[in-house]
Amino acid sequence: MPPANARPTWLLAVGDHFSRLSEDVMPTLIGSPARIEAAGNKPKIIEEFIGRVNSRHEALSIAKMTSPQGWEEPGQTPDFEEFTIVLKGMLRVNYRGGHIDVRAGQAVISHSGEWVRYETPEEGGAEYVAICVPAFAPFNVHRDEAE
């Protein structure tokens, strides 16, 4: 049995940042997200709370996305896992074998090295939270070339 003050193993696995924490470190408030430009055919709002831009974390990123009806982005083969929780509407995740419609209250995991393309085809668009491990960056998303 681990000692009472041991950190959970999942926390240590997320990245070196967490394993370096000491007991005298206090919580860090993220006062507001950074707005990041989104890829796609229509404007989409990306609010990064934790990640390379807003908090200088490379181990993971957490962002809230708001995309309009009819938004779609180029396909990608990322070097990260993306864990997505849909808060409102429906997010369609296209993959080589078809697509998955992820609705409010559901989640989906897109795996590193697998091709995916996201879109929000239904009325009202979608609002969702994406967690990427390691953190999202333009250099590790590997978007499809424009045709």
PLM ranges: what are they?
Residues 51-52, 72-78, 95, 119-121, ...:
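Short histidine-centered beta-strand/loop micro-motifs
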Residues 97-112:
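Short acidic-glycine-tyrosine-enriched beta hairpin
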Residues 64-67, 78-93:
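Short, conserved beta-strand element in jelly-roll/cupin
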Residues 10-59, 66, 74, 141-147:
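A short, N-terminal "cap"/entry segment at the start of jelly-roll beta-barrel domains
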Residues 72-73, 92, 108, 112-118:
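Histidine-centered metal-chelating micro-motifs
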Residues 112-138:
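Ligand-binding loop in jelly-roll beta-barrel domains
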Residues 90-92, 99, 115, 125:
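Structural motif
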